[in-house]
A protein has these predicted regions:
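N-terminal secretory signal peptides that target proteins for export/translocation
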Residues: 1-6
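Hydrophobic alpha-helical segments, principally membrane-spanning helices and signal/leader peptides
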Residues: 8, 40, 204-206, 645, ...
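Intrinsically disordered, low-complexity peptide-like regions
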Residues: 9, 362, 415, 527-529, ...
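Bacterial N-terminal signal peptides
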Residues: 9-19
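Beta-propeller folds
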Residues: 22-435, 440-453, 457-460, 477
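Serine-hydrolase catalytic core recognition
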Residues: 236-238, 292, 300, 306, ...
């Protein structure tokens, strides 16, 4: 009798507890949760990363929809935190629909651009509609046509005083008065191969930044425009083929591969009052040099420009008057290997300036006097990441640095003599700051390895203001069975301390044996272990862990971001040192309880794809690999990036052979999945085709998937979902967790 009562009591208690279990049960991620355009959770979507100050108290950012498309721009009052629409897309659409020749679908697209160019105060916005320029005046909700020509107007910007708009048409530089609509052509020698005010492919990709094609700079007084002329006459062309149309679409682009003739860049200035344009530099052989930075002095009296040799073994900072004349050499930098361009000088009223340099092996801030004498304002075995600006009136310099943690990022300020340093961001993690022009406040985009971004306003003294956005305010991640990443330090065989991250499966049992999925990039100054939110990649890693795989990320020294001194050892020899460090990292994680090092898969894209193919043809430590968009022979990649680290093939013939996965294809022992965008204009699919042919000739088996309409990154949401479904299946088949 008593046994029956006990059983009934247990059943009753268990039944009562069921709702509690139902509420607290955690579930696994699915591919749809992360990559399906309609079903993915908000934490998997791209967060706004671009914040633009309209004035010193307002900024705006793009708001995106479920598929990542921009739906509107949000204007934020930095004092009150109030958010409103910068403009109503529907109202703009109504105006655009009145433009002759614009369809209903086009009106919707043109009124919701991915990015905008606005004047100071964000009163007027420039729009490109059917390759002509229009101004949308936000206050009056009126749309005004500026140009009406067969040619396409590109890279349009407002002058600092807001009176003019500059743009490039048919590779010539123009200006137009926004009131009178009077147009002036500022250059006349533009051709298909000679570009005024526009970068070619390699200059935007490797020197000024991916997606930055504008190669002109307004003087602060709006009276002149400095610009680069890029001459691609002798640069070999590469053809990218789109195979989807019945008749192939050919895209021909000047693309200098390592050792090829480079673009010839020259510096000019257009005087808007006289209409004259003169050349400023005195470079004897422009194709042998690179102009890597251009900036105006604040008083518009002179242009500062930085020049490097093509192998980037040195850097010269020079100045020249806006009216031309003699070149004034300011400083000359060299290092033990290559010299990275660290941006423009920040000028003070006494003609001195602040300058970022890593010539000691660590990037720090220097004050450079007019005579070229330098003294450091920051010192130590840590890196300054960015110099935001100088508040000379209040004696403050604002910058970001990885001083507290090499995998984090903080914002600091100090006095102009280097004293009085203050940490402005107390919370550990990564703080990406966007300052207003007055340096009185900044947008703080904070996250850590387990927390999605939180966007807030912080004043110049570090006092937190309004929270603008909390990406996990709905606590959506709490429904998932997530194991917080563990950040660890791993010694190499020669004592370098590598940063690493482990994500173990939930309910990890050290008496069992779990396989390893290792993610890498490995390229110079490109750490993957960061105390920052990893977005959809992080959620995919959690999904792997939930399915019984240990996720392992270990930054080899050259990728660590721990100063140039940690990257220089790879000079002239991609792959060898990186592989040694990755092997040391794999040995360390394999020695931990519950880890089966015999089942290890290496994954990477771009340089990470190179590293995966290199590792799998030069080592037997990994049983499988996924290589996306890989460089498989450095003869095939662009001159500026490759020669910075490897020199030219003429100067490093053996190095190019030694570092080629294609040359070593016969050594492949692991299971390999190759992925590549079919119209990749960066790392050409030629790399994968050459590697595939070498594998076939050697009798090697492998798997491959091409992505039509995809460039170096696969961005079509449907293809992204297919790619990760494929990758997940490959991991499960080969690691057998």
């Amino acid at each position: 009798m008593s046994r029956v009562r006990k059983s009934i009591r247990f059943i009753t208690l268990f039944t009562l507890a069921l709702p509690l279990f139902a509420q607290t049960a955690k579930r696994r991620f699915t591919i749809d949760d992360i990559y399906d355009r309609a079903k993915r959770i908000p934490a998997a979507a791209m967060e706004p990363r671009t914040f633009t100050w309209a004035d010193d108290t307002h900024f705006y950012f793009p708001r995106t929809g479920a598929a990542g498309e921009v739906t509107s721009f949000v204007l934020v009052d930095a004092v009150t935190g109030a958010q409103t629409a910068l403009f109503d897309p529907d109202e703009l659409e109504a105006q655009v629909s009145k433009v002759e020749g614009v369809s209903t679908d086009e009106a919707k697209k043109f009124s919701r651009p991915r990015s905008i160019t606005a004047d100071w105060g964000a009163r007027d916005v420039l729009l490109s509609i059917h390759d002509d320029l229009f101004i949308y005046r936000i206050a009056s909700k009126s749309l005004t046509r500026l140009t009406s020509t067969p040619g396409k107007e590109e890279e349009a910007t407002f002058s600092p005083d807001g009176r003019l708009v500059a743009f490039v048409r048919d590779n010539n530089l123009y200006t137009i008065d926004i009131v009178s609509k009077a147009e002036r052509q500022r250059t006349t020698d533009g051709t298909k191969k000679i570009m005024n005010g526009l970068f070619d492919w390699v200059y935007q990709e490797e020197i000024y930044g991916r997606g930055i094609f504008k190669s002109y700079w307004w003087s602060p007084d709006s009276r002149s425009i400095a610009y680069l002329q890029i001459d691609d006459t002798h640069v070999p062309e590469f053809t990218v083929v789109d195979h989807l149309p019945v008749h192939q679409k050919l895209e021909v682009t000047p693309y200098p591969k390592s050792g090829d003739p480079n673009p010839a860049a020259t510096l000019h200035v257009a005087d808007l009052s006289t209409g004259n344009s003169i050349r400023l530099d005195r470079i004897a052989d422009p194709a042998a040099m690179l102009i890597v930075d251009v900036a105006w002095r604040p008083d518009s009296s002179a242009v500062a420009f930085q020049v490097q040799d093509r192998e980037q073994t040195y850097l010269d900072l020079d100045e020249v008057s806006r009216s031309g004349g003699d070149i004034h050499p300011v400083l000359h930098e060299t290092t033990k290997a290559w010299v990275d361009n660290e941006g423009s000088p920040f000028y003070l009223k006494d003609k001195s300036f602040l300058w970022l340099s890593e010539h000691t092996g660590w990037k720090h801030i220097y004050r450079v006097e007019a005579d070229g004498k330098q003294r450091p304002l920051t010192m130590g075995q840590w890196e300054v990441r960015k110099l935001f600006g100088i508040d000379e009136k209040n004696d403050w310099v604002y910058y970001s640095a990885a001083e507290r943690d090499p995998i984090g990022l903080d914002v600091y300020r100090m006095h102009l003599d280097g004293s009085g340093k203050q940490l402005l961001t107390e919370r550990a993690g990564t703080h990406e700051a966007t300052f207003n022009a007055a340096l009185t406040r900044f947008v703080d985009n904070w996250s850590d390895v387990a927390t999605p971004p939180q966007i807030s306003i912080v004043d110049a003294a570090g006092k937190p203001g309004k929270m603008i956005r909390d990406s996990n305010s709905g606590h959506e991640l709490e429904q998932f069975d997530i194991n917080k990443p563990e950040l660890v330090h791993v010694p190499t065989r020669d004592g370098f301390v590598m940063e690493a991250e482990i994500i173990r499966p939930p309910n990890f049992d050290p008496t069992k044996k779990y396989p390893i999925y290792e993610h890498t990039y490995s390229g110079p100054h490109a750490p993957q272990v960061r105390n920052a939110w990893g977005g959809s990649t992080y959620l995919f890693h959690q999904m792997l862990a939930q399915n019984g795989v240990v996720v392992w990320i270990c930054d080899n020294r050259t990728a660590s971001g721990k100063g140039a001194q940690s990257a220089w050892p790879l000079y002239k020899n991609f792959g060898e040192l990186e592989l040694r460090d990755l092997e040391d990292g794999l040995a360390w994680i394999s020695s931990q309880p519950g880890i089966d090092g015999s089942r290890a898969l290496l994954n990477g894209w771009s340089f990470g794809g190179f590293m995966t193919t290199y590792a799998l043809t030069h080592s037997t430590k990994w049983s499988a690999g996924i290589a996306g968009g890989p460089v498989t022979d450095w003869h095939d990649y662009d001159s500026v990036y490759t020669e910075r680290y490897m020199l030219t093939p003429e100067h490093n013939k053996d190095g190019y052979v030694r570092t080629s996965p294609t040359q070593a294809a016969a050594n492949l022992q692991a299971h390999l999945l190759l992925l590549h965008g079919a119209i990749d204009d960066n790392v050409h699919v030629q790399n994968t085709v050459q590697f595939v042919y070498a594998l076939q000739k050697a009798g090697k088996q492998f798997e491959m998937m091409l992505y039509p309409k995809s460039r170096h990154g696969v961005t079509d949401p449907d293809l992204v979902k297919q790619l990760h479904t494929l990758a997940f299946g490959f991991v499960m088949r080969n690691l057998k967790p």
